[in-house]
Every structure is written in C-alpha cells, then in structure tokens.
Amino acid sequence: MSKPHSDVGTAFIQTQQLHAAMADTFLEHMCRLDIDSPPITARNTGIICTIGPASRSVEILKEMIKSGMNVARLNFSHGTHEYHAETIKNVRAATESFASDPIRYRPVAVALDTKGPEIRTGLIKGSGTAEVELKKGATLKITLDNAYMEKCDENVLWLDYKNICKVVEVGSKVYVDDGLISLLVKEKGADFLVTEVENGGSLGSKKGVNLPGAAVDLPAVSEKDIQDLKFGVEQDVDMVFASFIRKASDVHEVRKVLGEKGKNIKIISKIENHEGVRRFDEILEASDGIMVARGDLGIEIPAEKVFLAQKMMIGRCNRAGKPVICATQMLESMIKKPRPTRAEGSDVANAVLDGADCIMLSGETAKGDYPLEAVRMQHLIAREAEAAMFHRKLFEELVRGSSHSTDLMEAMAMGSVEASYKCLAAALIVLTESGRSAHQVARYRPRAPIIAVTRNHQTARQAHLYRGIFPVVCKDPVQEAWAEDVDLRVNLAMNVGKARGFFKHGDVVIVLTGWRPGSGFTNTMRVVPVP
C-alpha cells in the first residue's frame, strides 16, 4: 500500500491490522496479526439477544441497547401472547427513549422465533420449575397417555409426539434437553416405550426431545406456529426465525401464513437437522437468511461435525449475499459467570472470521446472571475479530464469485468497496429506501462501516441482519429539491459518523446516492473528504 498523502486525515482505519489485512497469503496474514493493534471502532457484526425474565424490563433493555444489542429475539417455545406483547412493548419503549437525539438513536429490530415442529416433554409433578434426577442404568417409561401429561417423574415421562412408537425402533436413541439426557429404547408398545437411561442428570419440565435418524413426520408449521405468526404480523415484528426448516416448501408455508400484511417480514430459516443441511441450497434460495442453530444440530448430527456445517452454511450465504446468523452456546458459561471461557471467546471470534453477519445470545441474556456483560463481551470480541479479517483475499474471492452479473447496483457496490480499499475510506455512506443498495454493498464486506440513511423505519431495523450496516433514520421531511434532500441526508450521516468516532475532519468517505428520486437508482459514487 502506498503511504497516504499528508493532507489526508489519519483515518483510524489505517492502523487496524491493516498490515495483516493486505498480506499476500493466508499464512502471511496470520503471521502479521498483532495483539497491540487497536480494534475496529464501529462493530460490523449484528448482536441478537434473546429477551427473557433476566432482561425484559425497560431499564435493562435500555442498558442492553447501549451495550450493543441490535435485534431482540423472542422465543415462542415459552410464554403466552400477552407475555410477548408486553416484551415487545418494552423493547420499543426502550428504543424510543433514545429517539430525541437523532445522532445517538439506534433502531432495534424485533425477531419472533417460532416453536416449530418440535417435541417436548410434560410437566414434572405438575410444576414448571420442579426437577427429578434420572440415574444411569435406570428404567424410564415414555408414555403417550395424557393422564401423565402433568405428572412426569423419574419413572414415567409423557411427551407430545403421538407417532413416536411408529418412528423409533428398539435400539434407537431418544435425547432430552439438548442431548444432556440420553435414553436407549429397549422395547416398544402401542402407546409407550421402555427405555434405559444411558446418560442421566436432572430433568426439568417441558424440555425438547430429539430423535436422531428417525423420520419425524411433524408438519412444518404447527397450529401454534400459525397463531404465533399471525400474532407477529399484528405486532409488526421485523423478522421471523423459523425453527426446524427441512426443505424449501417449509419456508413457503411460513410465507403463506404471514400473508400480504406480513410480506415485508424477513424469514430466517433455522437449520437444525440432517435433512436441512442436505437440502441447504433450496432452503437458502427460498429464505431471506439462515441461522446456524448449533444446539439441535449438534444432537441431530455428530457434535464433531457441527463446525463443518457452520463453515459450509456461512460460506454459501456469503457467496449468495444473504445474511447468516451463528447461534447457540456462544458464551454459555456467562449464564452463571461474569467472564466467558477462553474457548467461548475463540468461538465468537471464529464465527465472525468465518463470515457470520450476526452472532446471537440465548440463555446468556434471557435467564442469565450477567446479561449486560455478555452483550459487551460479544461486542468487544466481534470488533477484534473484524479487524483481523483477511480483507484483501475475501474481497477478491467475492468479486470472482459474482463476475458475470450485469446488475447495475451490484457493479456500483463492487466498485465502491474497491474504491474504499484504495483510498482507505473511513466509511461508506449509502442513501437507501428499500435497503437493497446497502445490502449489496455489505455483500462485498468492506472494512469500513456502511452508514445507511433511510426514512423507512423497518428498512433501518432489518439492516442489522447484514454485516457492516449501521442504519441511521432520517426524520426530517423530504426537501422539494432532490439535490438538497441528498445533502440533508449525507450531512446527517456525516454528523453521526463524527459523533460515533467512525471518522474525523479530513478523513475520506465514499458517498453512494441516486441521481433522481425513486427506489433502485443508487448510481452515483463520490469520494468526499469529511468537512
């Protein structure tokens, strides 16, 4: 790289692992990484937090937004519609509490995570919090008799899948609670199984059940899911995380339920079993994005193969330019401890290095003792990992992967990201209504943050799904003269960037705008020094 001219501001971006990012080979890139190099100022990876009892008050939600939460996830495997409606209200109240300052305002998206066609156990002794100890070698009867629905104990376990006796064989395994408890089927009757406890432990109420290898014939969208999705449309959620997606037609079913009123809701398919991994390409095509749901996936396929599935899915999503979320057990130990294990720190960083657009927290924020610390930890790790990306190689490969496209917006996006590397731009400013222009730029993974200015609130909230997009909502009325309206929005982005420390006077930014009103006309690129 040639040295920047002396009249150019000393953009912070020139120091961050830049030496490593521009290496010629991957080995050389690794050799040049430097622990004393500062991290990226703007975090490019989205942080998704599951909201539960530990985090649903407006006060804690405000702190979580300050700490870096971009998307609030509501898990519909638990809780009533009233409970979730209140949580959504609280998330929005917390978000709007920052609305008076357009520079500091951060739109937060709401995601509905469906229960999906899952199998769950009944209540232990009639209580949601009771637990029983299952001893290794003990006999446990699994029954479909509804008399035991709320009377499970260490001898009898009820579950809600009526065809279990048809799909499992003697010698099959039944896993409960993310695989913590494993049962071996010894004999089967018409409506019961006799199993031996292979791996014991304490069993709580309403735990998930996995039947690896069994051809489970549950519908893609259950009756409960239909009610939940309709509730989501009424509540104006921004995205749906669809559980246990096995094929493209499952995604179409979810879309059908969302209907005309929910047509702008993004559908993120959760890949949680062998069939989903096998039919990944058709699912990716039908979806707006993908979640690598490592919890159930790690039971349905061997645990030592999960990383292969993760890398394959992230790679294919990056190639297709669709968002991908890495989830489950990212900072699991922080449910009970204030610091993560070294392995967890590594895991979060490697998910970012693999190319994940977003990283997710589940129990850490929903029920953990340290919800804020977990968000801050993900924020810090993501910034370090982003600085350490092998940007030069990544950009070359992304361009090579899409060289035959004649899409004008794609050409603009590619050109602007290339220019941002050449002039060491501190940010890319994109004016967008539908968000498409910003998504295309994000696809080429610039080092610098993409400040996307929009008047559409939903566009701003959904932009968090894409790596590198920093959405800014313009609340000023549209100016009559198009050129003045463009200047108004670019100035807003400049002010936000300066206030957030992304750049300062004299740095260079790249500005992408349309030369006339109307969606789809982002076709002008300017290289502008920051005033």
Swiss-Prot record:
Modified residue annotations for Phosphothreonine: T41, T195
One example of a Gene Ontology biological process annotation: cellular response to insulin stimulus
Record GO cellular component, one term: nucleus
Chain positions found as N6-acetyllysine: K62, K89, K166, K266, K270, K305, K322, K475
Binding site for ATP: N75, F76, S77, H78, R120, K207
Classification via InterPro entries: Pyr_Knase, Pyrv/PenolPyrv_kinase-like_dom, Pyrv_kinase-like_dom_sf, Pyrv_Knase-like_insert_dom_sf, Pyrv_Knase_AS, Pyrv_Knase_brl, Pyrv_Knase_C, Pyrv_Knase_C_sf
Molecular function GO terms recorded: ATP binding; magnesium ion binding; mRNA binding; potassium ion binding; protein tyrosine kinase activity; pyruvate kinase activity
Organism: Felis catus (Cat)
Name of the featured protein: Pyruvate kinase PKM
